[in-house]
Amino acid sequence: MARTTSQLYDAVPIQSSVVLCSCPSPSMVRTQTESSTPPGIPGGSRQGPAMDGTAAEPRPGAGSLQHAQPPPQPRKKRPEDFKFGKILGEGSFSTVVLARELATSREYAIKILEKRHIIKENKVPYVTRERDVMSRLDHPFFVKLYFTFQDDEKLYFGLSYAKNGELLKYIRKIGSFDETCTRFYTAEIVSALEYLHGKGIIHRDLKPENILLNEDMHIQITDFGTAKVLSPESKQARANSFVGTAQYVSPELLTEKSACKSSDLWALGCIIYQLVAGLPPFRAGNEYLIFQKIIKLEYDFPEKFFPKARDLVEKLLVLDATKRLGCEEMEGYGPLKAHPFFESVTWENLHQQTPPKLTAYLPAMSEDDEDCYGNYDNLLSQFGCMQVSSSSSSHSLSASDTGLPQRSGSNIEQYIHDLDSNSFELDLQFSEDEKRLLLEKQAGGNPWHQFVENNLILKMGPVDKRKGLFARRRQLLLTEGPHLYYVDPVNKVLKGEIPWSQELRPEAKNFKTFFVHTPNRTYYLMDPSGNAHKWCRKIQEVWRQRYQSHPDAAVQ
């Protein structure tokens, strides 16, 4: 153990502690070097400050010189100085945890790295690179490194806490940003890249997962483990192995194994496309096929893509890295910031502006449909119970405990309302015996029974399931449980399930379009028959029976 620790201390000397300065701007930090000598190594000599940050003892006979000694340096932070809370994220060799400093009550995102794992997986260069790059950055659109410390087993990086998490979470939640939101967040990313490239740094893994949002919903770019600091005479960096993420990797990295500042501009083009369309431009079943599409520039714009945003993306997704808008060969960031897409942007104080409310945009898919806008602002913090009428709620899906009159006889056909061969819904006032008969009938003749785990289907029908600007036909199956399954009707494959919880809430937008809100995502669905309100009504009915008639189910 001693040798392992010594190796890491030699390879990853944590010598600098970044501390807050008394500047009015929260983005300002000051780097304080503790010592020019390596930190103490167990079993070795200790000529510099101790690792706990206390000053070294004065040498005997040096009393006459004590007045010339520098003041003692601040005590190095230790794990016991913090109360550690929830896990914010996990990487291949690190965990990020929310922590509150006991002395100041300040919150930090502390990145904890296991020394043994770093050495075993040869990740020492990633750790040192991330620390070195972050110590160079002083800009409001980047996560800040405030301090570093270590114990015998772990390294700790104290980072600014981006309270609202990843940009990707919001893309998945609302599907497609409206033009105002797309413009604002693209402008912040451009401003950040201009600063980063001005420092001679290439990020090399820019993607929505690595763009966080702080408490005020401004961006904070993070994850510099694969970043590269260019030497003054170099314009590009060689990559001996693949770095980055498949959907956002630039063609020059695939063909020449080199990355340049313009590689980040390619990733910017992919991100803009994803903000508008809801999905990245290059998509396929595996990484090899994605790479083939990238090097052939094979991608399409969906209908209703904002025209000015499309023009900008086309000027960024260019195979020749020297022809991308914003690169040095194209006169830098001036022409990029002057693009018509940004004509209403005030660049000077973006970090002080109030971000627009996140608003989903669902353009009409045909001339007969309407555009839909979904204001996501209230959904950020409010997912209370649906306030719906509890009239005639039953304790189960059977009629035995309800106040509703039971229908006479055992003719189960009276409960089934067929709309067409692939659409029907059930009345819910059936007995347990009738439910058994309905389930037998379903198992024997309904081709969708195989997808619902032997649950009774209460309503089903084809819908167009929207994800951003893309739509796919699905068979939607509302069942007991409750469950909301959706199936590919052509390939007969179960594609997924809308997660049920007490916070689930249906919302009809017009005759065809309805939303199903869940805490982590809003599902956008369109009923081609124009009966969106019937889906919402049936979902509400099942929701009431699940949560208002079974209060204990809400905490399960």
Swiss-Prot record:
It catalyses: L-seryl-[protein] + ATP = O-phospho-L-seryl-[protein] + ADP + H(+); L-threonyl-[protein] + ATP = O-phospho-L-threonyl-[protein] + ADP + H(+). Changing R474A: No PDGF-dependent translocation to the membrane. The keyword DNA-binding does not apply. This is 3-phosphoinositide-dependent protein kinase 1. GO terms for biological process: actin cytoskeleton organization; calcium-mediated signaling; cell migration; cellular response to epidermal growth factor stimulus; cellular response to insulin stimulus; epidermal growth factor receptor signaling pathway; extrinsic apoptotic signaling pathway; hyperosmotic response. Residues 459-550 form the PH domain. Keywords: Acetylation, Activator, ATP-binding, Cell junction, Cell membrane, Cytoplasm, Kinase, Membrane, Nucleotide-binding, Nucleus, Phosphoprotein, Serine/threonine-protein kinase, Transcription, Transcription regulation, Transferase, Ubl conjugation. It comes from the Eukaryota. The modification Phosphothreonine is found at T354, T513. Residues 82-342 form the Protein kinase domain. The active site is at D205. ATP binds at S92, F93, S94, K111, S160, Y161, A162, E166, E209, D223. Induction: Stimulated by insulin, and the oxidants hydrogen peroxide and peroxovanadate. GO terms for molecular function: 3-phosphoinositide-dependent protein kinase activity; ATP binding; phospholipase activator activity; phospholipase binding; protein serine kinase activity; protein serine/threonine kinase activity.
